[in-house]
A protein has these predicted regions:
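N-terminal nicking endonuclease/strand-transfer module with a His-rich metal-binding environment
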Residues: 1-226
Length: 226
């Protein structure tokens, strides 16, 4: 069983594109979460140089197309979380790699980092928004999140894993029971707790740690995390 989420990554104000890419990929490939890089794989890129390679592809895209949209998406992250005790780190990495390959149709470079530091094993799949030919960008289409979840379900079934059943509107999840559907608020809450475990010096540092995980901070009368 795997719950998925598709996150569009943007360049943060005050930081270069290369810095933003490095922040996001460094968090995903954190040795403390991947057993010193044991559970990292890649497609058409080198994990140690992925930020530089992604950044170089943006320059090549600009050279070829002369297009540089404001607020452009620099990369996408697929968060894929598995039910505790159902999968090994090795198989989770395989499922993540297949998900990245089939969702991008093999047209975009990506890394897969499998985090094993929590009860539920989960993948961070980061793929370049620019394609391998550096002449097109991945476009987040309508219902892409639904398409991603269905693809993940298919791959899970192919691996003999369970999938998230469709629950009836009237159903309620009892406290203490593992939910059939992983609540996105629970995922966000855990990510915030993970950031707090790193003991940020202040609120600004906490927001920076959340941005490194792929969240976008919206400024206004009230700050929001998306």
């Amino acid at each position: 069983m795997a719950a998925t989420r598709l996150i569009a990554m943007h360049q943060n104000k005050g930081r270069s594109l290369a810095q933003c890419l490095k922040d996001r990929t460094d968090y995903a490939m954190n040795g403390a979460k991947t057993e010193d890089g044991r559970y990292i794989s890649s497609y058409q890129c080198t994990p140690e140089l992925v930020d530089l390679e992604f950044a170089q592809s943006k320059k090549e895209y600009l050279r070829k197309t002369w297009r540089q949209p404001k607020g452009d998406v620099i990369a996408y992250q697929i968060r894929q979380s598995f039910k505790p005790g159902e999968i090994t780190p090795e198989e989770a990495g395989e499922v993540g790699y297949e998900t990245g390959m089939r969702f991008t149709k093999g047209k975009h470079a990506f890394i897969v980092a499998t985090h094993v530091d929590k009860a539920h094993i989960h993948n961070h799949i980061i793929f370049n928004s620019t394609n391998l030919d550096c002449d097109r960008k991945f476009r987040d289409f309508w219902f892409s999140a639904i398409a991603l979840q269905r693809l993940s379900d298919i791959i899970c079934l192919e691996h003999g894993l369970s999938i998230i059943p469709k629950s009836k509107p009237s159903e309620r999840v009892k406290r203490g029971k593992y939910p059939d559907r992983i609540n996105i608020r629970d995922v966000i809450r855990e990510d915030i707790l993970n950031a707090l475990e790193q003991k940020p010096a202040d609120f600004a540092q906490l927001l920076k740690l959340l941005q490194d995980q792929g969240y976008e901070i919206k400024q206004g009368d009230r700050k929001s995390v998306v």
